[in-house]
């Protein structure tokens, strides 16, 4: 018995050490999982996901996992987790979004993975800073044309005003003029279907289409629209230099590498990416500017010094003009900081350690630009609209402020970010040059219902405009 006891003790000791090491290696962040199988805390999370994330951070600390709708989402909020999110080779962007792309645009996963990098390189080249000068002239012309439709004066919801300007401008520039009808009934249809598709995009990315009848109908409407118009879009060439529009270049890659059957689906995905964020950014920027009289006055003085005081002329906006109106660019960037997307995501492909926790493969690693931009450590007085903070950004070298993540970061940042900034800047310049504008309602609260993209306003915000004389 005396000989057995030491042996048993050694075995038990080794077993205890092994279990201790295993426990250490498998130590995971606190998990909020609820009690309903598969759904988890999906109902609570879905009611107000942005608020849910912040409350969880306060309660559980800088890293925590949320189990909802069959997904484990691990949120990181401090430097170490952010660095892993941005730099680790153990996390992957494409695998994180492939299901979303499949559900919202019906693009097969194998097709998406095969084409994504090629399309990204094309988009980045075509929409990059080197080529921005090619867009300024047409942007100006398209915006002038749509501003004419507003008349000399009026009152309308600011969000609708921006939609009526930017929907046709963006489609005409990046897709083809034939896609956006001039027929009032069809224009109304386009607006209605896109708003439904956009507003429920997040639900469409997670739930079966049979539960989202109106969203599914809108999706099918756009797929049919592209299927009908793609032959004409492909046949149309630029009268100036025979160059291709963004959609034409996309279709060229899609049909060369796969099949023309996927073309309408990529048309829909590109349409959503082009319109879903530009419109709310322009809305919020105008709303912030018009609700800050000192900033509004400074911008108007800048516009008058560059273009003169009258608002009747169809001015042309050059790159030099934009440089002389930097305050407007700062306002756009400050708006994007305050109204950043709720989350960006990566998929964990190999277990990764963050703050002594092990995040297992299969988890979705989540970072919230919305809350990161409200951390006073990175942005002092984070809730205030302070465009002047952007003086510190090296915008000449196309660099943002540290920890500004609205366009993502790393290998797959938004490839059209500089075009989007240009479009919103020019939209604001031309509106404020042509019209005296004032808000009839207070700045609305934002909706906390969605995590994807720039948040929408919760209520209406009417604008009164009158042509400057």
UniProtKB/Swiss-Prot annotation:
Residue sites binding heme per the record: 414
InterPro entries: CYP450_sterol_14alpha_dmase, Cyt_P450, Cyt_P450_CYP7A1-type, Cyt_P450_E_grp-IV, Cyt_P450_sf
Disulfide pattern: none
Signal peptide: 1-23
CDD domains reported in the protein's UniProt record: CYP39A1 (cd20635)
Tissues expressing this chain: Liver specific.
Reactions it catalyzes: (24S)-hydroxycholesterol + reduced [NADPH--hemoprotein reductase] + O2 = (24S)-7alpha-dihydroxycholesterol + oxidized [NADPH--hemoprotein reductase] + H2O + H(+)
Biological function: A cytochrome P450 monooxygenase involved in neural cholesterol clearance through bile acid synthesis. Catalyzes 7-alpha hydroxylation of (24S)-hydroxycholesterol, a neural oxysterol that is metabolized to bile acids in the liver. Mechanistically, uses molecular oxygen inserting one oxygen atom into a substrate, and reducing the second into a water molecule, with two electrons provided by NADPH via cytochrome P450 reductase (CPR; NADPH-ferrihemoprotein reductase).
Protein known as: 24-hydroxycholesterol 7-alpha-hydroxylase
Organism: Homo sapiens (Human)
Gene: CYP39A1
